[in-house]
Amino acid sequence: MLTVALALVLACPQRIHVTAPSARATTATLTVTECGRRVLGPWRARVGYRGVSAHHREGDGTTPAGTFAIGPVVYGLDADPGVRLRYHRLRCGDWWDEDPRSRSYNRFRHVACGATPSFRGGSEALWRATVAYRELAVVEYNTAPAVPGRGSGIFLHADTGHATNGCVSLPRNDLVVLLRRLRPGASLTIGA
């Protein structure tokens, strides 16, 4: 059975497409295709408050353009909503390290609850973002190895009512439908 599932993934790629009408737009359209057929969307998405850029840098307010893998773990504050990927329920002390000087830049980190992490910068206390990060998937932008300053913490997450700092956001109901459908090997293409 596993061999059949693997063959399906290889023969029938799952692709997420985020298309902004222009490089400066803060909204986009998200669709999901499998075997070249649209299976989800079109949905309204939000991108960075400065649009989409192939030259994204840490803190510049753009969403990076290009094609990226989706991380193997979905994170969230609530119980697993039924995703196919591995799920990690966020708890106090779960951070995304966004400090370009840190050795663990652009990675998930857990520190003791209440402890001050050794990394600083714009690092995110994931468990505190109760609207945006009820569920999130990591966009594998600038990972393995991460280049300091090139950008970090690019996620698919719930819409908060405005443009993002560089992530892609969707209305929460659409996000949960997408996260449940995601399978290993999915790719995300962002462009204008």
Predicted regions and their residues:
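Short cysteine clusters
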Residues: 167
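Conserved "landmark" site that anchors the functional core of diverse proteins
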Residues: 171
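Sec-dependent N-terminal signal peptides
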Residues: 2-8
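Cell wall/extracellular polymer interaction/catalysis modules
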Residues: 8-164, 175-187, 191-192
